[in-house]
Curated annotation (Swiss-Prot):
The active site is at H8 (tele-phosphohistidine intermediate), E86 (proton donor/acceptor). GO terms for molecular function: phosphoglycerate mutase activity. Pfam families: His_Phos_1. GO terms for biological process: gluconeogenesis; glycolytic process. Signal peptide: none annotated. The record marks H181 as: Transition state stabilizer. Belongs to the phosphoglycerate mutase family. BPG-dependent PGAM subfamily. Keywords: Gluconeogenesis, Glycolysis, Isomerase. This is 2,3-bisphosphoglycerate-dependent phosphoglycerate mutase. SUPFAM superfamilies: Phosphoglycerate mutase-like (SSF53254). Pathway: Carbohydrate degradation; glycolysis; pyruvate from D-glyceraldehyde 3-phosphate: step 3/5. Its EC number is 5.4.2.11. It catalyses: (2R)-2-phosphoglycerate = (2R)-3-phosphoglycerate.
Length: 228
């Protein structure tokens, strides 16, 4: 079976160099073109998907829709989960990355962004970016609502959905596409390829580029793209 992972196309806040996290930012015009290009590439590879998964965030949802439209596969089932959302950047969400580095120092911002288990400062529950005020997360328990996540935290959030849903589709011998985010996809890739905590920090995923894995029904990875 084929498992295709794709990071959403460039978003408006990627373009503005801002921490995005769970903020529901749209694709930029370039991001839409990246998604179209990805769909054409996958169509040229003669890939046919049986099921798709994505997050609750429109930049990933729209990327998936554009890809499937280019492939003439908009009819397949699509499942959305908050567990595939981007890493929550806490109080940093909405801030310009360069300005944040000037305020806190390059070293501190680098630690927040690139360490495995250090989370950024927690978001204030009165902030406009606090997820619980968004109705799509209204049914989540307070304990499931992140105030800020490290990559380790993101992995702990993502993997239960892999085990409960995505992997089951592969075991049913279905071809699967997952459109999500840089850190939620790093979580899946780390697990699939057994990448160390140190090495995963060096994995940078390009926006809008499909990554094709071949996986057997026992969930063994038979082939994977060159990632580093």
């Amino acid at each position: 079976m084929k498992l295709v992972l794709i990071r959403h196309g460039e978003s408006a806040w990627n373009l503005e160099n801002r921490f995005t996290g769970w903020k529901d930012v749209d694709l930029s015009p370039k991001g839409m073109e990246e998604a179209k290009s990805a769909g054409k590439i996958l169509k040229e590879m003669n890939l046919v998907f049986d099921v798709a998964y994505t997050s609750y965030l429109k930049r990933a949802i729209k990327t998936l829709n554009i890809v499937l439209e280019e492939m003439d596969e908009l009819y397949i089932p699509v499942y959305k989960s908050w567990r595939l959302n981007e890493r929550h950047y806490g109080a940093l969400q909405g801030l310009n990355k360069a300005e944040t580095a000037k305020k806190y120092g390059d070293e501190q911002v680098h630690i927040w962004r690139r360490s495995f288990d250090v989370a950024p400062p927690s978001i204030d529950k009165n902030s406009e970016y606090y997820p619980k005020s968004d109705r799509r997360y209204a049914d989540l328990a307070d304990s499931d609502i992140p105030l800020g996540e490290s990559l380790k935290d993101t992995i702990a959030r993502v993997l239960p959905y892999w085990h409960s849903d995505i992997s089951k589709s592969l075991q049913e011998e279905k071809n699967v596409i997952v459109a999500a985010h840089g850190n939620s996809l790093r979580a899946l890739i780390k697990y699939l390829l057994n990448i160390s905590n140190e090495d995963i920090l060096n994995l940078n995923l390009v926006t809008g580029k499909p990554m094709v894995f071949e996986i057997d029904k026992d969930l063994k990875v038979l082939s994977s793209p060159e990632l580093f």
